[in-house]
Amino acid sequence: EPQLPALDESTPTVLQTLDTSGVVIQPLKSSQLVRDAVVIIDNLRNGTLVRDRTIVQRPDGRFQVMEIDGELYIDERSYQRYDALVDWFVSIEEAALIKNYELFKPLMQEAYGEIGYPDADFTDAMLEAIDVLLATPVPETLVQVKDDEVMYTYADPAFEALPPAQKQLLRMGPDNI
């Protein structure tokens, strides 16, 4: 078992290890990768998003809508902004993901303790976050939205009532959920 670096200096080691295990690291961007990932996962398990702790590059382009018979719908071209990110994520070999998770779990556990959970198992938080994402409904048809001047909201009350993390997944499109 290799010696792990201090949490503060772990990002270069994590990136190098991911790279050597076949994970494409180009989309990753964070100077504190482990800490940021832990904060993101902790928030995801509660259905929330943390936009200031993004560990991957944001997609190019803007959210787009289209009008059909006077109603607004998410333009399917809007979903394509996320294709590269989703393709990258699903390209990660499960074995490499598990191996690296197990290797760096002590650092993730330390970071989890720093944000207020010193006695909780980070793996439980990870599984809860995955459950939240897996519970996102997959739309069968075009998704109707309303323009509320500041932002678009979902016309379907069931979609609008979803936690922010699931609403973000809906914005990525049914093929990317």
Predicted regions mapped to residue ranges:
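A cross-kingdom marker for long, charged
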Residues: T141-I177
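Long, hydrophobic, amphipathic alpha-helical segments used as structural scaffolds
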Residues: R45-T48, D52, E93, Y112-D119, ...
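Mid-length scaffold segments of soluble, non-membrane domains
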Residues: Q64-D124
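Short secondary-structure subsegments characteristic of cysteine-rich extracellular domains
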Residues: D121-P137
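N-terminal Sec/ER secretory leader and immediately downstream segment
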Residues: E1-E71, R77
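Acidic/histidine-rich, surface-exposed loop or edge segments in extracytoplasmic proteins
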Residues: S10-V24, S78-S91, L162-L170
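Generic detection of long, well-ordered alpha-helical segments
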Residues: P27-V34, I98, P174-I177
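Generic structural concept
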Residues: V38, K105, L127-I130
